[in-house]
Design a protein with these regions (language model features):
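Periplasmic OmpA-like peptidoglycan-binding domain that tethers envelope proteins to the cell wall
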Residues: 76, 277, 285-355
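Short, conserved micro-motifs composed of acidic
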Residues: 1-153, 157, 179, 192-194, ...
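Periplasmic peptidoglycan-binding/tethering modules of Gram-negative envelope proteins
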Residues: 141-281, 354-355
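Residue-level detection of beta-strand scaffold positions
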Residues: 38, 120-122, 187-189, 207, ...
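Extracytoplasmic/secreted envelope proteins and their assembly/folding machinery
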Residues: 40, 256, 264, 268-271, ...
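Short, histidine-centered active-site or binding-site loop motifs used for metal coordination
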Residues: 15, 68, 250-251, 256, ...
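Conserved beta-strand positions that form and line the central face of beta-propeller blades
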Residues: 42-45, 98, 251, 258, ...
């Protein structure tokens, strides 16, 4: 019997149960880097000599719920019981743990399903003689890692859905990165974002021959709700020599060229873009609003552009691929007639100087 589980795709995306002379076993199939599936093999972390079935991998991609027959090898309340395991940081799995009474009974339980927020679970039980569906509030210890659904629609400059594109999700203070494909028919995408550690998240568009563009989502924006990225928040623009593109969310302290931690987080994504596109040469441009002395603004913009260049070099981008220049207040994107517009003019751009 096949049990499809597609949530993340990095760890486990398909589990099956098969019946042989001895009972049921759970099998695992891992997704290869090219998107194809590996051969299903027994998932011996959970399999016993008895019946093991009904696997459910939560959207956190780390917590697996399943059912096992209670035996001396795997004691429980009775009959078929619900268990769970978690994947550890080193890739190993914890020891199976019984979800406990009164969820498990002396009869059989099957098919546990946990809501995306990890708070409510549903399952079938034959307690009392007939199969019925029950729900309960999942206790803290058995809950998966907190996650949220990040979704949006990606369209090009003409308003048409984008095909052959990928959304990259990165976490501040972590090397963990996930990728989801954009639906080429309608431009929609959806990604599971882990929110347990309360980290800011950077969402980046990746499409061959197109510019780097990202959106920073503050950890406070998640909470218990899903997050929708509006179409205008992410641009999909072709790389053109001489064209300028803004790197969003590059922030500095007032009158300072010192990069903030959030700015460094964004620039790590930009560095990945440059390393992946090793033939591109870019010029880093610093811009200010019109508040303050002209010469001081020019010097500040030069220092900020240089600090961006130096940080990119520290991340492994070759220095001979980068130049930096400041323009002060001389090249506003919009009129400096409101605080909102002045904020738009305090920006860092990159210009394609060669490909």
């Amino acid at each position: 019997k096949s049990v499809p589980l597609y949530y993340d795709g990095r760890i486990i995306t398909g589990l099956t149960t098969t019946t042989d002379f001895f009972g049921n076993d759970i099998y695992i199939s891992k997704r290869r880097e090219d998107g194809t599936w590996g051969t299903a093999v027994p998932f011996d972390v959970v399999n016993t000599a008895g019946k093991d079935k009904s696997p459910f991998l939560h959207q956190d991609s780390e917590t697996l719920y399943f059912v096992s027959q209670c035996t001396k090898e795997r004691p429980g309340v009775g009959g078929l019981d619900i268990f769970y395991i978690r994947q550890q940081k080193d890739g190993s799995w914890s020891e199976p743990k019984n979800i406990g009474y009164p969820i498990n009974s002396e009869s059989d339980e099957l098919g546990l399903f946990v809501s995306i927020d990890g708070e409510v679970a549903y399952f079938s039980s034959r307690v009392g003689g007939d199969w019925n569906i029950f729900s309960f509030e999942l206790y803290e210890e058995a809950r998966p890692q907190s996650v949220a659904l990040l979704k949006g629609v990606l369209k090009d400059e003409n308003g048409s859905p984008v095909s052959n594109a990928t959304i990259e999700v990165a976490y501040e203070g972590s090397d963990e990165i996930t990728h989801v494909k954009v639906n080429g028919d309608d431009g929609k995408y959806a990604a599971i974002v882990k929110t347990e550690k309360k980290q800011d998240v950077m969402v980046t568009v990746k499409k061959e021959g197109h510019a780097f563009d990202s959106k920073l989502i503050a950890k406070e924006d998640f909470g218990k709700k899903d997050v929708t990225i509006r179409g205008k928040d992410l641009d999909v623009k072709k790389l053109v020599v001489g064209e300028a593109y803004t790197i969003n969310d590059i922030l500095y302290a007032t009158s300072s060229a010192v990069l903030s931690d959030k700015s460094k987080f964004i620039l790590k994504g930009f560095a990945r873009f440059l390393i992946e596109n090793e033939t591109i040469k870019v010029g880093i441009q610093g811009h200010t609003d019109d508040v303050g002395d002209d010469n001081r603004n020019l010097k500040l913009s030069e220092d900020r552009a240089l600090s961006v260049k130096q940080y990119l070099v520290s991340l492994g981008v070759e220095a001979n691929r980068l130049t930096s220049k400041g323009f002060g207040e001389t090249m506003p994107n919009v009129p400096n007639d409101s605080e909102q517009n002045r904020a738009k003019n305090r920006r860092t751009d990159f210009v394609i100087e060669g490909m």
